[in-house]
A protein has these predicted regions:
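Alpha/beta-hydrolase active-site loop
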Residues: 147-165
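Glycine-rich "HGGG/HGxG" loop immediately N-terminal to the catalytic nucleophile
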Residues: 60, 121-123, 127, 136-150, ...
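Non-catalytic accessory segments flanking enzyme active sites
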Residues: 14-87, 91, 285, 294-297, ...
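Alpha/beta-hydrolase
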Residues: 1-16, 21-22, 26, 195-291
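Short beta-strand element of the alpha/beta-hydrolase
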Residues: 92-100
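Conserved hydrolase catalytic core segment
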Residues: 114, 118-121, 128, 166-222
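The serine-hydrolase catalytic nucleophile loop
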Residues: 101-113
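C-terminal subdomain of alpha/beta-hydrolase-fold enzymes, centered on the catalytic histidine
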Residues: 241-392
Length: 392
């Protein structure tokens, strides 16, 4: 089905219901002076609740979101929401950017204008992009899957068809978190259609094809130990979402404060903010993302992607290798990040950038740094590329 324009919905009734629920929150106790040691801080969450109930303006947020061009397109019977903003130049490079969890397409709003209109924002006017930012199935305004199996491999297939439907025979891909997995699979499964891929995260399930019993260098063994320890110390959320997301859904889909605590804790822990999440994200930014999950009732369907990922991890089979050019942008406060040689076992790494600051939510935290790296990488590939199929 051809893409059709989409209007971001707004409901006064839904806002009234949200405020009623916030006002009736049944608060737990907490051990005094423990802050975030046991999870989301009680005083912080009470402050967030007051702001959300009394001052947060969802209608204004919808108006801001609606300044972008939104569409929906049915791909393999799944309705996919996406933003499409055309580049302000004659040779715009098609670029699909995929978000992760617990983010949404909202993560990319700051970076879109930097890529579509670089001349206006101090970038190289010769390198601009047609930017496509879809919502993953089960997130935001995209449909939820009605059958098991909606994993990152299937999503990459949907994205390839979506870009074909938009008229892009060849394109570039970028992503972090689940978006890094989807972009990797696009490079792995559709190399003839890819100009290259740019990643600011390496999926935790990634394993290159290794010989049975292969002895790894200590730097790689050390990384794998650190990653395992990270999941022991900080991965409780992931274990629940990988194993029993439906059980978690009854709490998060019913209580807005439970939902906010579940999501905002991750922004605090994963961003480069030294434990003060409002150093990087305003209350409005945090709550716009949480409210999107609340209004669309998609927290449980988004968590299912972890369940599906456990059954379909990014483990390369013998002979599998991402041969298209790949750029890695390493932000220093990201979760345990593999050494370059571990990544190069599975990827054709042609650019590696050590960023001076930033964490897991790179597009939202450091849009200028990320946009510059994306433009430099794909701009160079575009100049060197002899195949014009990436253009419409």
């Amino acid at each position: 089905m051809r893409p059709i324009p989409f209007t971001v919905p707004y409901s006064e009734e839904a806002v009234a219901d949200l405020r009623l629920r916030l006002g009736r929150t049944r608060w737990p106790d907490s051990i005094p002076r423990t802050g975030w040691n046991y999870g989301a801080d009680l005083d912080f969450m009470k402050d967030i609740c007051r702001y959300w109930k009394d001052r947060f303006d969802w209608k204004k947020c919808v108006e801001e979101i609606s300044k972008f061009s939104h569409f929906r397109c049915t791909v393999q019977d799944i309705g996919i929401h996406f933003i499409l903003e055309k580049g302000k130049g004659p040779n715009a490079i098609p670029l699909i950017i995929t978000h992760g969890w617990p983010g949404s397409f909202l993560e990319m709003l700051k970076i879109i204008p930097l890529l579509t209109d670089p001349a206006k924002h101090g970038g190289d006017p010769a390198v601009c992009f047609d930017v496509v930012v879809p919502s993953l199935p089960g997130f935001g305004f995209s449909d939820r899957a009605s059958q098991p199996g909606m994993n990152t491999f299937r999503i990459a297939e949907l994205w390839a068809e979506l870009m074909q439907e938009l008229g892009y025979k060849r394109f570039a891909a970028q992503g972090g978190d689940f978006g890094a997995a989807v972009s990797t699979i696009l490079g792995l499964r559709y190399p003839e259609r890819m100009l290259g891929i740019h990643l600011n995260y390496i999926p935790g399930s990634y394993r290159p094809a290794l010989q049975p019993g292969a002895k790894l260098p200590e730097i790689e063994e050390s990384f794998l130990r650190d990653a395992d320890q990270w999941y022991v110390d900080y991965g409780g959320y992931a274990h629940l979402q990988r194993t029993t997301p439906q059980t978690l859904a009854y709490a998060l889909n019913d209580s807005p404060i439970a939902l906010a605590a579940w999501i905002i804790e991750k922004f605090r822990d994963w961003a480069d903010c030294d434990g003060d999440v409002e150093k990087k994200f305003s209350k409005d930014e945090l709550l716009t993302n949480v409210t999107l999950y609340w209004m669309t009732e998609t927290i449980h369907s988004s968590c299912r992607l972890y369940f599906e990922g456990r059954k379909a991890p990014l483990q390369f089979q013998p002979g599998e290798f991402v041969r298209v050019p790949c750029a890695i942008a390493h932000f220093p406060k990201e979760a345990p990040f593999p050494p370059r040689q571990w990544i190069e076992r599975g990827y054709n790494v042609s650019r590696w950038t050590e960023m001076p600051r930033g964490g897991h939510f790179a597009a939202a935290e450091e849009p200028e740094l990320l946009a510059r790296d994306i433009a430099q990488f794909f701009g160079a590939l575009n100049r060197a590329d002899k195949n014009d199929l990436y253009k419409k």
